[in-house]
């Protein structure tokens, strides 16, 4: 069964609620892997900056909760997440986020192949 990009995005929205609690859980995954998350003002074209050597993620502080969650989720594949260092709850959420992200990426790849 093939899902459209919109269907995958709807599944993401259904699976993840855009609340402060969810933001806290997503931040916890990143922090448990040794990263520091900072919210700052700045001219971020993409809304974020990663300082890999210092394990610092800087996000635009003017993002709403949904934007912060989406940005952190989009960043996860670029970060060195230590799965074994995560708590059980964080591991479950990380697996869920990565599975949804992989489905979305597959759909994007299929879209380019068929274009």
Regions picked out by a protein language model, each given a short descriptive name:
Residues 3:
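Cationic, low-complexity basic patches in intrinsically disordered or flexible, solvent-exposed regions
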Residues 7-10:
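Acidic, Ala/Val/Gly-enriched low-complexity intrinsically disordered segments
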Residues 15-51, 57-58, 83-115:
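Metalloprotease/metallohydrolase-associated module, dominated by Zn2+-dependent proteases
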Residues 42, 62, 76:
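Anionic group-transfer/hydrolysis microenvironments
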Residues 70-78:
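Active-site recognition of the HExxH zinc-binding catalytic motif
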């Amino acid at each position: 069964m093939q899902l459209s990009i919109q269907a995958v995005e709807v599944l993401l929205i259904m699976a993840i609620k855009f609340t402060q609690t969810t933001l806290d859980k997503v931040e916890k995954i990143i922090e448990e892997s040794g990263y520091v998350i900072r919210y700052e003002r700045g001219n971020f074209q993409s809304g974020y900056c990663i300082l890999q050597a210092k394990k610092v993620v800087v996000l635009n502080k003017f993002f709403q909760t949904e934007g912060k969650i989406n940005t952190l989720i989009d960043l996860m594949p670029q970060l060195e997440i230590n799965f074994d260092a995560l708590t059980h709850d964080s591991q479950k959420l990380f697996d869920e986020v990565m599975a949804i992200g992989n489905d979305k990426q597959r759909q994007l790849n299929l879209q380019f192949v068929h274009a």
